[in-house]
A protein has these predicted regions:
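Scaffold signal of the M16-like zinc-metallopeptidase fold and its non-catalytic homologs
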Residues: 134-137
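Glycine-centered structural positions embedded in regular secondary structure
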Residues: 67-69, 116, 164
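Active-site cradle of extracellular carbohydrate-active enzymes
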Residues: 114-122
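Juxtacatalytic substrate-recognition/specificity segment
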Residues: 2-110, 124-129, 139, 146-150, ...
């Protein structure tokens, strides 16, 4: 258990305390970086379940292309994780952002906003997302991405993540991260998404969707 930022590490499989310490250190880095940008920090400890064997996919039932999951706990496979430190940092940051979104927005946050925010903060920039979008003209609307991404095949899901990344980056460019936080808080109070979006981003949701689709 970390004595700094609120993380508790559990194991599914053989325990590895040295690995747990390294992962908590990297989570704490994400905690301060993301928390500082959003001025929001989880008040309750976050449990992190590390799958040290091949049990991760059996337990979470996620598609093969997923790297980890957040369902109230951060869950991730860790075999060989320290051999890919950059990727480990990105995955941990991504899932930590999901924990922050859950705290701020509750259950009413569209998937594209949740995943887009996590993707923006995990990466140094959005260049990879833009390169992927430049190679395809078949893109879903943001309205179509309010639900789970787990239905499409991996290629379609990659486009969904890229479009979500672009959309959230545009929101931040337009009104800043605090406006996104306020939108999440509106949703936690049960606010209508389109109305809350227009109030916080100062743009109709329909117009924003068109802007994101044509860029």
């Amino acid at each position: 258990e970390s004595r700094g930022a609120p993380f508790t590490v559990l194991f599914e499989g053989p325990a590895d305390e040295a690995l747990a310490r390294r992962i908590v250190e990297r989570l704490e880095s994400a905690y301060w970086r993301v928390g500082g940008a959003l001025t929001a920090y989880p008040a309750k400890p976050i449990s992190v379940v590390l799958y040290t064997t091949e049990q991760f996919r059996d337990v979470t039932r996620l598609p093969e292309w997923t790297a980890a999951a957040y369902d109230g706990r951060i869950r991730m496979p860790v075999r060989g994780a320290l051999e890919q430190i950059d990727r480990l940092d990105r995955v941990l940051c991504h899932e930590f952002v999901h924990a922050v979104v859950a705290m701020l927005g509750g259950r009413n946050v569209p998937t594209w906003l949740n995943e887009g925010l996590a993707s923006v903060f995990e990466a140094k920039d959005t260049a990879d997302a833009e390169r992927l979008l430049a190679r395809t003209s078949a893109r879903p609307t943001l309205q179509e991405l309010h639900g789970s991404f787990f239905g499409p095949p991996a290629g379609d899901a990659a486009i969904a993540y890229a479009l979500s990344t672009r959309a959230v980056q545009r929101m931040i460019d337009l009104r800043g991260a605090p406006a996104v936080v306020q939108l999440l808080q509106d949703l936690a109070r049960g606010g209508d998404f389109a109305a809350a979006f227009q109030q916080r981003i100062s743009m109709r949701y329909e117009d924003f969707q068109s802007m994101v689709a044509r860029q």
